[in-house]
Regions:
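Beta-lactam-recognizing serine transpeptidase/beta-lactamase-like catalytic domain environment
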Residues: 60, 154-199, 205-391
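Periplasmic/cell-envelope proteins involved in peptidoglycan metabolism and beta-lactam response
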Residues: 1-176, 186, 195, 268-276
């Protein structure tokens, strides 16, 4: 009898272990099945390092990539070079997080039916970018290393996200043998992945921080004699601007003014503004993760002054600063940026972007004031004529 009881208990324990294992697998399947199927090493989904998923179009319907059989890029060499940092190359030197992020929709995967949807036709994806705008932006950059980004702050659509230097994926130059420096950092997507010392554009963040904290108005004045000492550190300006208001200081990009303003504001309020505006942390956008850093935790008074001018250890991505510009334009809030507009298969929409907003990051009054200050800088300092129809 005891032997039967022991066997029964053993069988029960085994059944419990089996049930627990099955449950654990089901949970893992529910959570991770899409990742298993779209894993970059899967021969069912990838050819080499490239997703085999369909056709990619720009916002106008111009086809810029066909991945149904290898990789067929645009017939326009300039468009190929202008979009390779978004679409990736054939060898994985330039990755395509955008396509990887939507691999599940592109290949037709479903947790219930698996890859059966893949047999129902090729996926078509429409991006928010304009191939023509990408091409024009890359041509305008010329030999400069950098990025150009344009987005609709009302909808979130990224119209342009181009990186220079670049290359034609159908005619790859001898990058490894280049000794001119022309291709330095060519594999880097400078719009999403590169964080830059922002310099004087950060003065808008300092202005926003001061206005929001009621620490200063746009009429607050400081006197610039070309240099000053703050916290034992010398702050040098490009000229002797005399007594300036905040509006005038932004137009003249006065380092002395903004050093004094940042020091008076203090590191806690400047840090809080950078945090709130999304300039100290990450921003995820359709597979990309942009990272900016404004860390004043160890900053003394002089370092805070330099941080307010966009120096010290400030590092900001183009995407995150562009979003901040959208917040100003949108009266204190803006749409979150995105790249993928729509994915369809066999006449059915399997993904469509929805506009999401940042929430109110600035008061409407502060946003209006900042917009007016920026407009004043264009009209009174740089000249509206230089910006053509944009003004």
């Amino acid at each position: 009898m005891k032997k039967v009881s022991r066997r029964a208990l053993f069988a029960l324990a085994l059944a419990i272990v089996l049930a627990a294992g099955t449950l654990a697998f089901c949970v893992k399947y529910a959570v991770n099945a899409n990742k298993w199927v779209t894993f970059s090493g899967s021969p069912h989904v990838y050819t080499g390092t490239n997703l085999t998923g369909g056709k990619i179009y720009d916002r106008t319907g111009a086809r810029i990539l066909n991945t149904t059989d290898g990789r067929v890029y645009s017939s326009d060499a300039a468009v190929r070079a202008a979009t390779v940092h978004l679409l990736g190359d054939r060898y994985g030197y330039i990755s395509a997080p955008l396509l990887g992020n939507f691999a599940e929709q592109m290949i037709g995967y479903d947790k219930i039916t698996g890859l059966s949807e893949a047999s129902k036709g090729t996926a078509s994806a429409r991006l928010t970018i304009s191939a023509d705008v990408q091409k024009a932006a890359l041509q305008a950059l010329g030999s400069y290393h950098g990025t150009v980004g344009v987005y609709n702050y009302k909808t979130g659509e990224i119209l342009c996200a181009v990186t220079s230097p670049s290359y034609d994926p159908d005619n790859i130059p001898d990058i490894a043998g280049d000794e001119t420096g022309d291709y330095d950092g060519v594999y880097l997507n400078r719009f999403f992945d590169a964080a830059y010392t922002p310099g004087s554009i950060f003065k808008l963040v300092t202005s926003a921080a001061a206005l929001e904290a009621d620490a200063a108005s746009k009429d607050q004045t400081y006197t610039c004699t070309g240099e000053t000492i703050i916290g034992g550190q010398e702050i040098i300006c490009m000229g002797e601007h005399g007594t300036l208001s905040m509006t005038q200081a932004l137009a003249h990009s006065c380092n002395v003014y903004y050093g004094e303003l940042a020091a008076a504001l203090g590191k806690d309020k400047l840090q809080a503004a950078a945090d709130r505006l999304g300039l100290n942390g990450t921003l995820r956008c359709d597979g990309y993760t942009a990272r900016s850093t404004v860390d004043l935790s160890d900053a003394d008074e002089g370092s805070v002054a330099w941080a307010g001018i966009g120096q010290y250890t400030d590092q900001v991505t183009a995407l995150q600063f562009l979003r901040f510009m959208g917040v100003i334009a949108g009266g204190g809030e803006a749409a979150e940026p995105y790249l993928m507009q729509k994915i369809s298969r066999a006449g059915q929409t399997v993904y469509e972007a929805k506009t999401e907003t940042t929430g109110q990051l600035l008061s409407a009054a502060t946003a209006t004031t900042l917009g007016g200050m920026m407009r004043s800088a264009v009209v009174n300092q740089y000249g509206a004529w230089q910006f053509g129809a944009l003004t």
